Amino acid sequence: MATTGRPVKRVKRDISDGIAHISASFNNTIITITDRKGNALSWASAGASGFRGSRKSTPFAAQVAAEKAGAVAKEYGIKNLDVHVTGPGPGRESAVRSLNALGFKIVNVVDTTPLPHNGCRPPKKRRV
């Protein structure tokens, strides 16, 4: 078990621009906010926000995770965000909307989901 030591001091740097990487899978949504060089400033996920099981894959869980990551990024002084969205999950748009609602100026949204140019054979279709 991790012990609760002294609180982490967040040094307010002169970082005004950042990148929000949103990885939205079918099971979870992970949000990482970095500076322009790619150094992670804050992160949150639906699972780390207290959602378990099928509730992790909901848009509301992605919204809560984005609010947590955005609140920490605000302490660093970030105002403008580029958003890079990866994956087909249900939390894609709600995470972007909640970052916008926190007061970040979203400069652009880029979909970086990898698409094969007829590469590997996909897994077989599910029969439910």
Swiss-Prot record:
Q: Is Cytoplasm given among the entry's keywords? A: no
Presence of the UniProt keyword Ribosomal protein in the record: yes
One of its Pfam families is Ribosomal_S11
Q: Which keywords has UniProt assigned to this entry?
A: Ribonucleoprotein, Ribosomal protein, RNA-binding, rRNA-binding
- GO cellular component, as recorded: ribonucleoprotein complex; ribosome
**Gene Ontology MF annotations:** rRNA binding; structural constituent of ribosome
InterPro entries (alphabetical): Ribosomal_uS11, Ribosomal_uS11_bac-type, Ribosomal_uS11_CS, Ribosomal_uS11_sf
Question: What residue stretch is flagged as signal peptide?
Answer: none
GO BP = translation
Q: How does it assemble?
A: Part of the 30S ribosomal subunit. Interacts with proteins S7 and S18. Binds to IF-3.
Would you identify the family this protein belongs to, as annotated?
Answer: Belongs to the universal ribosomal protein uS11 family.
Role this protein plays: Located on the platform of the 30S subunit, it bridges several disparate RNA helices of the 16S rRNA. Forms part of the Shine-Dalgarno cleft in the 70S ribosome.
Q: What is this protein called?
A: Small ribosomal subunit protein uS11
The opening ranks of the lineage are: Bacteria, Pseudomonadati, Pseudomonadota, Gammaproteobacteria, Methylococcales
